[in-house]
Regions:
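Bacterial N-terminal signal peptides that target proteins for export
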Residues: 1-9
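Bacterial N-terminal signal peptides
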Residues: 8-16
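Extracellular/lumen-exposed scaffold segments
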Residues: 21-166
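Intrinsic low-complexity/disordered segments
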Residues: 1, 17-19
C-alpha cells in the first residue's frame, strides 16, 4: 500500500514538473498578458460648463508601464484606434474630441514597422455641450493595449464625469 502511494505521488510530481517546465520554455509571444488595468482615467471627476454652450474639457489618462495603446490614427488600417464617446441621452453631447499626436515606436520583433501609439499619460480634449442640470456621464474610452510582443483584446473602460450645466 505504501509503495502504491509513493508511486502515485511520484507520478503526480513528475506531471506537475513537466507542466511547469513547458510553461517556462514557451515563447513570450504565446504567454497571455496579465495586466488588466492597462489604462486608467485620472481626472476630472467633476466639471462645470455653461449650459447649451460648447466647452473644452481635458480628460487625463495613464497607461500602465511597459504597455502602449494605438493612437487615434494608427499607422495601419488593421490596428484598433483609441476613441472616446459619450452615449446619447445623458444630457451631455460630445461635440468633438481632439486626440494627441501619437509617438512613433518600433517593436523588437519588427524594427521596419513604425507604430503610432500613446504611452505614459495622455490627454483627450473633449468639447462638451450640456443641458442645464447635473449629469453623471458614463463616457467610454475604447482602446487596444500591447506590449513589445503581443496585444490584449480590445477593451472599453467607463469614464465617469459629473458634468454640471449652469
Amino acid at each position: 500500500m505504501k509503495k502504491q502511494i509513493c508511486v502515485g505521488v511520484a507520478v503526480l510530481s513528475l506531471g506537475a514538473f513537466a507542466a511547469h517546465a513547458q510553461e517556462l520554455g514557451s515563447p513570450a509571444q504565446s504567454r497571455p498578458l496579465v495586466k488588466t488595468d492597462a489604462v486608467t482615467y485620472l481626472f476630472p471627476e467633476q466639471v462645470s460648463v455653461p449650459a447649451g454652450k460648447p466647452s473644452q474639457v481635458a480628460l487625463h489618462f495613464r497607461i500602465a508601464q511597459g504597455l502602449h495603446i494605438n493612437s487615434h490614427t494608427p499607422s495601419d488600417e488593421f490596428l484598433i484606434p483609441t476613441t472616446f464617446s459619450i452615449p446619447d441621452g445623458s444630457g451631455v453631447r460630445l461635440d468633438a474630441a481632439t486626440y494627441p499626436a501619437g509617438s512613433s515606436i518600433t517593436l523588437t520583433y519588427d524594427p521596419t514597422t513604425k507604430l503610432s501609439v500613446y504611452t505614459g499619460e495622455f490627454i483627450i480634449q473633449a468639447r462638451l455641450v450640456a443641458t442645464a442640470g447635473n449629469h453623471l456621464v458614463q463616457g467610454k474610452l475604447h482602446y487596444q493595449a500591447c506590449d513589445q510582443n503581443q496585444c490584449m483584446p480590445p477593451k472599453t473602460i467607463t469614464v465617469a464625469i459629473d458634468v454640471i450645466g449652469k
